């Protein structure tokens, strides 16, 4: 059985036992998070939500809170002596999917 959930403005296909990385969510390591925005549940019988499947939830456990590798952003304008270098590290949350309840 699998499901498609919406979190952090993205849609992610998940299965039980899978590890996923999502945009940072509030919670400590070991906390259980429940996703109510389930768009689709597949398996023996498929359920399509309009826009969400009623009564369907996905539970996940927080494994890690972290930050991605640094990206370097560099801007410049020719002939104007304008140079700007900036770094960015996107925060993320690593989750393990416990169960899909449909």
Curated annotation (Swiss-Prot):
The keyword Transmembrane does not apply. InterPro entries: bL21-like (IPR028909), bL21-like_sf (IPR036164), Ribosomal_bL21 (IPR001787), Ribosomal_bL21_CS (IPR018258). PROSITE patterns: RIBOSOMAL_L21. It comes from the Bacteria. GO terms for cellular component: cytoplasm; ribonucleoprotein complex; ribosome. The keyword Ribonucleoprotein applies. It holds the Pfam family Ribosomal_L21p. Keywords: Ribonucleoprotein, Ribosomal protein, RNA-binding, rRNA-binding. GO terms for biological process: translation. GO terms for molecular function: rRNA binding; structural constituent of ribosome. This protein binds to 23S rRNA in the presence of protein L20. Belongs to the bacterial ribosomal protein bL21 family. Part of the 50S ribosomal subunit. Contacts protein L20. This is Large ribosomal subunit protein bL21. It comes from Listeria monocytogenes serotype 4b (strain CLIP80459). The gene is rplU.
């Amino acid at each position: 059985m699998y499901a498609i959930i919406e979190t952090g403005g993205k849609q992610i296909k998940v299965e039980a036992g899978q590890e996923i990385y999502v945009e940072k969510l509030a919670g400590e390591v070991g906390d259980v998070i429940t996703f109510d925005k389930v768009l689709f549940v597949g398996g023996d019988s498929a359920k399509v939500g309009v826009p969400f499947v009623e009564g369907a939830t996905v539970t996940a456990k927080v494994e890690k809170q972290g930050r991605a590798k640094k990206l370097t952003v560099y801007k410049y304008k020719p002939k104007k002596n304008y140079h700007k270098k900036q770094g960015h590290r996107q925060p993320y949350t690593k989750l393990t999917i416990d169960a899909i309840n449909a």
